[in-house]
Amino acid sequence: MATAASNPYSILSSTSLVHADSAGMQQGSPFRNPQKLLQSDYLQGVPSNGHPLGHHWVTSLSDGGPWSSTLATSPLDQQDVKPGREDLQLGAIIHHRSPHVAHHSPHTNHPNAWGASPAPNPSITSSGQPLNVYSQPGFTVSGMLEHGGLTPPPAAASAQSLHPVLREPPDHGELGSHHCQDHSDEETPTSDELEQFAKQFKQRRIKLGFTQADVGLALGTLYGNVFSQTTICRFEGLQLSFKNMCKLKPLLNKWLEEADSSTGSPTSIDKIAAQGRKRKKRTSIEVSVKGVLETHFLKCPKPAAQEISSLADSLQLEKEVVRVWFCNRRQKEKRMTPPGDQQPHEVYSHTVKTDTSCHDL
């Protein structure tokens, strides 16, 4: 007892080490060289999953060598062969059909737990040299294998396994266009018919006394489709697309029928047109009448109200038309004459501020 107390290292050399594993208390090998002990203990603590604490199948060393004989005869050493293509395909199918199997827990690391052939020990090469476990491509940062070493299914298989709602819908544009075309073959007019209708529509619209804005407003009030004056103008000029021309033709045709049936009697179209006319129609003056007005303008650029009334009566024009003509003529004279070359009879026009607001109505 005294000898044992005086030499505490003899206990380590005479007794064997005991490892506390999950399988039970196992007797270890006697104390050896510290360098060899570190290598063997490290290999004992690194199974196929790379976790240093999960050694379930590695037993104690039986001799004093750096590599254990039990490790050489272990199931992993016997399976030190790369899996074949059939095994990989089988593993991919198993992973594709049962994704939850791939995410196994650390307690099922035994090679025989898988249906496919077990993978070789990643920490030992064929020559018996240790490798860095954490540098292997099959390991993650935590040391666990991704999906049990099985490769993910290809992109084509994953696309086919999607729900029909999640898949990319097919292009129905061509199908829809063919369907619409087959459905409206009988009603679709030709380009010649559209051109002829546009000419007839313009002539009849002018004959009835409606403007393009009146037609657009009437279509919006009667049929619920509001069109601007620009749209009607482009239709008459054949500047719309063929599809839009086909859509607008039946509406304009209905408007023409309604306008023709209501000719000579005030109807809703006349009321709508009257509401849409926010300004008066442009008056066209004949050349002879313009000559008389021009002669009177040279004599008196700004006639009085009585002169405008008498001149309108002599020319059989409205008083407002004559007044607007003189107003526009004075504005035109200002634009044509430079500021330094004004005539004496136009000097007084700068003092009149009411004339500057005159416009052609």
Curated annotation (Swiss-Prot):
Family: Belongs to the POU transcription factor family. Class-3 subfamily.
Region (Disordered): 99-131, 144-192
Record-listed Phosphoserine modification sites: S265
Biased amino acid composition, Polar residues: 122-131
Protein name from the UniProt record: POU domain, class 3, transcription factor 4
UniProt keywords, alphabetically: Deafness, Disease variant, DNA-binding, Homeobox, Non-syndromic deafness, Nucleus, Phosphoprotein, Transcription, Transcription regulation
Bias (Basic and acidic residues): 165-183
Keyword rRNA-binding: no
Single GO MF annotation: RNA polymerase II cis-regulatory region sequence-specific DNA binding
PANTHER family: POU DOMAIN (PTHR11636), POU DOMAIN, CLASS 3, TRANSCRIPTION FACTOR 4 (PTHR11636:SF83)
Location(s), subcellular: Nucleus
CC annotations in GO: chromatin; nucleus
Gene responsible for this protein: POU3F4
Tissue specificity as recorded in UniProt: Brain specific.
Residues within the DNA-binding region(s): 278-337
Subunit structure: Interacts with HNRNPU.
BP GO annotations: brain development; cochlea morphogenesis; negative regulation of mesenchymal cell apoptotic process; regulation of transcription by RNA polymerase II; sensory perception of sound
Pfam families: Homeodomain, Pou
Protein purpose: Probable transcription factor which exert its primary action widely during early neural development and in a very limited set of neurons in the mature brain.
Domain POU-specific: 186-260
Xref: InterPro entries: HD, Homeobox_CS, Homeodomain-like_sf, Lambda_DNA-bd_dom_sf, POU, POU_dom, POU_domain_TF, TF_POU_3
Involvement in disease: Deafness, X-linked, 2: A form of deafness characterized by both conductive hearing loss resulting from stapes (perilymphatic gusher) fixation, and progressive sensorineural deafness.
